[in-house]
């Protein structure tokens, strides 16, 4: 047993050493890449208006710039501080990932609940229907979920007749109502996805924006009651975050230097 323990420990040490080497190599490559990009594109460009005029005698009510005949737009460039450059670069990368995962999640979040409701345990009356359902779904999972639902329903009936409504009763109620809750969440998520999509189209993709839409809705709700607009805004933001998580779980991706795998 002791020799085996030393063998396992040695194997882990070897893996740990290789992992540290990979981390050092990855950090070195990232530092070199960031330094190169900062040296090449680490500038901030500002569009300014250039005014030029001849020199005139200055009085209390006259400035030479007011009589200038040329108005030229030019660009002024300056070296950006390294922290500002890092923030801007990370913002660009996060915006791309946010757009990808959020777009996928807005579709998968309601669809996953729709499929969960569609594949819920159903009452099987004939042998032909039973064979058809078992051919389309996993037999073990369906039978287990159906038995659990049947047992919970019978337990509810017994406890309701006996007047006992403890923790077990509430747990069984939750199991029985889970399918209906899934359908209600599906309708809610689908509505939120459609509203977000409409807002992106009419306010962000159209230039100039055609209509403020959600911005105006939040303002009106906030004027109706102090916390109503804030609460609604928080719900929409929370749904957007959940959409990004759902998109990452279903999509996953492989970048140039690292991989982002679907979560489990």
Swiss-Prot record:
InterPro entries in UniProt: LMBR1-like_membr_prot (IPR006876)
Entry annotated with the keyword rRNA-binding: no
Major location category of this protein: membrane
Membrane topology: Multi-pass membrane protein
UniProt GO cellular component terms: membrane
Subcellular location: Membrane
Keywords for this protein: Membrane, Transmembrane, Transmembrane helix
Annotated TM spans: 23-43, 96-116, 194-214, 225-245
UniProt record similarity statement: Belongs to the LIMR family.
Protein name as catalogued: LIMR family protein SELMODRAFT_416716
Species the sequence originates in: Selaginella moellendorffii (Spikemoss)
